[in-house]
């Protein structure tokens, strides 16, 4: 469960990252495809080369959805319901992949936010991304 302090730290960090959604999202996806190549199977029609328009576009969507989750942190289930349905019923993404992408997002945030990505911010974002992953996996049960 996220504390009030966690929510504050998440909001503050997100304010610094929000204007870089396409860049950070593409970097996180590229990192995921490189580190966990099995994740590429969900994108058979994408040009998965780093910086491709499709990777940048999807990265922007992913981080845009994450921004929506930040805004609706107290009601993640409702805010992420449509995405949960899409990934569970249409795309049939294995929920473990949400955790893999979460790890890559953490690395990208740490790399770009530098000293602002304190251990406390890291811990708060870890809890937040775990909550988002759990909500995205809700429809699988």
UniProtKB/Swiss-Prot annotation:
Annotated function: Involved in oxygen transport from the lung to the various peripheral tissues.
Q: Which cellular components does GO assign to this protein? A: blood microparticle; haptoglobin-hemoglobin complex; hemoglobin complex
Q: Which family does it belong to?
A: Belongs to the globin family.
Q: Which domain of life is it from?
A: Eukaryota
> Does Metal-binding show up as a keyword for this record?
yes
Q: Which residues form the Globin domain?
A: 1-141
Q: Recite the lineage of the species.
A: Eukaryota, Metazoa, Chordata, Craniata, Vertebrata
InterPro entries documented for this protein? Globin, Globin-like_sf, Globin/Proto, Hemoglobin_a-typ, Hemoglobin_oxygen_transport, Hemoglobin_pi
- The gene is HBAD
Quaternary structure annotation from Swiss-Prot or TrEMBL: Heterotetramer of two alpha-D chains and two beta chains.
Read off the SUPFAM superfamilies from this record: Globin-like
Q: Which keywords describe this protein according to UniProt?
A: Heme, Iron, Metal-binding, Oxygen transport, Transport
Found in which tissues?
Red blood cells.
Positions annotated to bind heme b: 58, 87
What protein name is recorded for this chain? Hemoglobin subunit alpha-D
Biological process, per Gene Ontology? hydrogen peroxide catabolic process
Which Pfam family would be a valid example here? Globin
Query: Single GO molecular-function term?
Result: heme binding
